[in-house]
């Protein structure tokens, strides 16, 4: 099959059907059995370091700074009161944050230093004491030995943090008394510092955990309630959106109840003040699990996918985890979109629907002003996302499935032909904004699908040029799959104008993570920069930071560790101070 070997492949729209079909062929051939990936998920260690990595090739000196990554670390806790505790879902792996310092030296050779720190020691200590995990989780399977009374009572315990999803830098509006807790003046190797006022780790809960940018030490937690007293709901979005020009931060807060309530808000970078842009409380606007949303030049846009919570959200309190609190997928349950004005105080200005689907990650959104046939100026909104046909992917991230324990991969994905729904499609919708605000909660309007690029020509964990957020753009970088392993197995640059794809593939057993695009200072071309990705070598149980040319996806260099590093979720590159 055309893409099964290592290399860089240039593919066009004409190859889409062939390459998508090869995913199915690889899955049916059970190719994952010859792709070891346990090193990306299990028995991961903390290395406070800093440790110097071995550089092969080159990393441009202009990329000086720190690449931070976060995600699940260890997945088991030994020697608890009830034996070994096993985490069942990858999203519940105990948080660990990593820092790769990229430091040019006087002799011209770039050095890369690595350190990491666990972020959930308090929760791990609680598990050791009790022998089981209390508090809210994403998908931890219930312990049959734990009584229903103990299960329910954990809802009322103080929340134990497991912030393991995304990183936010220079967050405005956080309580000033926390500033004294951050060293950020403690230099790393060779006096290295990064240019940031603060650094936080987020999850799909309203709290974000502050960490020391230099030592990675976990510090105080800030909740959305600290930003504004009306933001009291328990759920939010890991991926806050940021205006690339002003730096203003946007997110939403979801409160459960008889009528669930969404509050979409902005934190002003200049003043630190938080403004609630819209409050939406309507029985036709269901509570749902959402991991990301959209930002355009003038609007915040929420897409509520088919992942609705049961009992108007209150089932989360009964189940104690997100997966078991969601209603089963229903193809009649359309995605509902909320368009909120972010410039002029108009609140909810439009709603529309698209066919039932699920997504973790928005990619980007933007606006275009056009003249219709009558010469009237209209505004079209465009939304790009990594869309799944249904919600099967969520349970595909149980550790048993990812590491193929007891043939779990085949048992899960082959049942009811679920494998047909394992790969996302880059999907673009277009919606014409009404000339006057139309906050119709019947969602009678609809958007048009205008672009669809299937895997492996596009993928998951998408990133773009950071200054193109909310604006027209051309390129997206993502981690894609060819069906050779239980997660992703390739990196891809997708041209949205031509549907061309440049696909990087490593040797067998080399599992890449999210690509992080770093633009070259002063560059004009959107793809003039480099792409970093953490790659886990499952054969030798080691890892390396891969550096690719942003234009060609050819390797420039890599910094190798002689131990495994968790594949993780998301990262951020911060320039040197």
Swiss-Prot record:
Matching entries from InterPro entries are given as: Carotenoid_Oase
The answer to whether keyword Methyltransferase applies is no
For this UniProt record, the keywords arranged alphabetically read as follows: Carotenoid biosynthesis, Cytoplasm, Dioxygenase, Iron, Metal-binding, Oxidoreductase
Chief place where the protein resides: cytoplasm
* Reaction(s) catalysed by this chain's protein: torulene + O2 = 4'-apo-beta-carotenal + 3-methyl-2-butenal
Give GO terms for biological process: carotene catabolic process; carotenoid biosynthetic process
The protein's GO terms of the molecular function aspect are: carotenoid dioxygenase activity; metal ion binding
Please verify whether the record's keywords include Oxidoreductase: yes
According to its UniProt record, where is this protein located?
Cytoplasm, Cytosol
Report the induction information.
Answer: The expression is subject to photoinduction and is transcriptionally co-regulated with the genes of the other carotenoid biosynthetic enzymes.
Cellular component terms (Gene Ontology): cytosol
Q: What is its EC number?
A: 1.13.11.59
Q: Return the broad EC class.
A: oxidoreductase
Pathway-wise, it operates in: Carotenoid biosynthesis
- Cofactor(s) listed: Fe(2+)
Q: Where does Fe(2+) bind?
A: 239, 291, 361, 570
Q: Where is this region: Disordered?
A: 1-20
Q: Name one Pfam family in it.
A: RPE65
Cofactor remark: Binds 1 Fe(2+) ion per subunit.
In the record, the note on similarity to other proteins reads: Belongs to the carotenoid oxygenase family.
Query: Which function does this protein serve?
Result: Torulene dioxygenase; part of pathway that mediates the biosynthesis of neurosporaxanthin, a carboxylic apocarotenoid acting as an essential protective pigments and leading to orange pigmentation. CarT mediates the cleavage of torulene into beta-apo-4'-carotenal, the aldehyde corresponding to the acidic neurosporaxanthin. Is also active on other monocyclic synthetic substrates such as beta-apo-8'-carotenal and beta-apo-10'-carotenal to produce beta-apo-14'-carotenal and retinal(beta-apo-15'-carotenal), respectively.
Q: What is this protein called?
A: Torulene dioxygenase
The source organism is: Gibberella fujikuroi (strain CBS 195.34 / IMI 58289 / NRRL A-6831)
Task: Name the gene that codes for it.
Answer: carT
